[in-house]
Design a protein with these regions (language model features):
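Conserved acetyl-CoA-binding loop-helix of GNAT-fold acetyltransferases
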Residues: 107-124, 313-330
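Intrinsically disordered, low-complexity terminal tails and inter-domain linkers enriched
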Residues: 4-11, 15, 126-174, 206-223, ...
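A conserved beta-turn-beta hairpin within the catalytic core of GNAT-like acetyltransferases
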Residues: 87-98, 106, 131-133, 294-306
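A short, internal acetyl-CoA/4′-phosphopantetheine-binding micro-motif in the GNAT/acyltransferase core
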Residues: 98-108, 142, 302-317
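Active-site/acyl-donor-binding loops of N-acyltransferases
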Residues: 2-4, 151-212, 329-374
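Conserved beta-hairpin
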Residues: 58-61, 67-85, 259-291
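Anionic, Ser/Thr-rich low-complexity intrinsically disordered regions
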Residues: 11, 16-23, 28-31, 38-41, ...
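Short amphipathic alpha-helix that is part of the acyltransferase structural core
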Residues: 1-59, 72-74, 210-255, 374
């Protein structure tokens, strides 16, 4: 397939950006402009899963801080594909890349043309000192139970109790698998390799045996305390954990940024608990923590961030995470994110999945291309 875009310049007015020869004719590339999301939805259809729904949100008008460039591919004047590349202030080592082509227009080289043009824009910005790298990362779901329609949840809609039609999880999985196969082949052909796996997992209530909680009957039991999401101590713990599990994509997350991006009011953080080796009043340190992003208990699993002190040894970290998770799911289900880099949590979750006490809602893979980095 042909599809390499020629040398291109950026046009802030949203006019013709460049043209590219593809199988079956030629396409026009131009900057993203208002209304493109609706026009593309007509040819793309609804996203196949929750991950694709999230990734489509990357597509937006160009910006300088954070730096972003988005292009739309038109065939015969009709938008059929789009792509975006943008920089993250928290993870400066690589730029995010997302490209999507209408199903009827795939295998014509349109995606390749978009990637080539976006790489060119990144190279220009890097040469001008606007961004620190041209290395890229992209992600896609290999499996999913959660559809791409906002508000749909397989946990609460399998029986139609919400008034919406039940989620057809088999259809979601089938569509996701088909899309993933094509996406992975495309990324590999573009020089990308896998670097990380990230899963959103729902854990059933009572899935883990409860530990003894410190009290008169159990003076050596675990110490569980509530913590303010504005706490400096909690924010420092979250920052240390985040940095430790992102060694594969190093972060520049300051304590202030962690408070804003992970714990602040805009995140929806509704409360937190910490597991200590002794009461705080006695100088006890945080061994593990959980931050809830669900304001009230409900039938659907609460969205929770679980982390631990990265200075703990493997055995101690495993125990701290198991104890905290057991207390979290004592009565209600939760859903958590677990990455390959989160070894203690991944080990526990894999055991729960194997015992049918947990299930994967979305299974996402991250691929990278570092060949053109800084």
């Amino acid at each position: 397939m042909t599809g390499a875009a020629g040398a291109a310049g950026h046009d802030d007015g949203g006019a013709l950006f460049d043209s590219a020869a593809v199988v079956g004719g030629e396409i026009v590339l131009r900057p993203w402009r208002p209304g493109d999301d609706l026009a593309l939805l007509e040819v793309w259809g609804d996203p196949a899963n929750a991950q694709q729904h999230q990734d489509r949100a990357m597509l937006a008008e160009d910006a300088e801080r954070p730096w972003r460039r988005a292009l739309v591919a038109e065939a015969a004047g009709v938008p059929v594909a789009a792509g975006v590349v943008y920089a993250s202030s928290v993870h400066p080592r690589r730029l995010w890349l997302y490209v999507e082509t209408a199903a009827a227009e795939r295998r014509r080289g349109i995606g390749r043309a978009l990637v080539a043009a976006l790489r060119g824009l990144a190279a220009e910005a890097h040469a001008a000192g606007a961004i620190p790298t041209t290395a890229l990362k992209a992600r896609f779901a290999k499996d999913a139970l959660v559809p791409g329609v906002a508000g749909a949840d397989p946990q609460t809609e399998t029986d139609g109790a919400t008034g919406r039609p039940p989620v057809d999880t088999d259809a979601v999985r089938s569509q996701t698998a088909a899309l993933a196969a094509g996406t992975e082949a495309f990324l590999v052909a573009e020089g990308f390799t896998p670097v990380q796996r990230s899963r959103r997992v729902a854990i059933a209530p009572g899935a883990i045996g409860l530990p003894d909680v410190r009290g008169e009957e159990h003076p050596d039991g675990v110490v569980l305390e509530e913590a303010s999401t504005g706490s400096v101590e909690l924010t420092q713990a979250v920052t240390a954990f985040y940095d430790a599990v992102h060694a594969w994509d190093p972060s520049t997350l300051s304590v202030g940024a962690a408070q804003q991006l992970l714990l602040g009011p805009a995140t929806g953080a509704a409360g937190a608990v910490v597991l200590r080796d002794a009461p705080k009043a006695e100088g006890g340190r945080i061994r593990a923590f959980a931050v809830s992003y669900t304001p009230e208990r409900q039938d659907a699993p609460a969205d929770v961030l679980v982390g631990w002190d990265p200075e703990l040894g493997e055995k101690d970290a495993l125990q701290a995470v198991a104890d905290l998770l057991a207390l979290l799911v004592a009565q209600y289900p939760v859903q958590i994110e677990v990455d390959e880099a989160m070894a203690p949590l991944e080990r526990i979750v894999d055991g729960l999945i194997g015992g049918n006490a947990a299930r994967t809602l979305v299974d996402t893979y991250v691929f990278v291309d570092d060949t053109t980095g800084a």
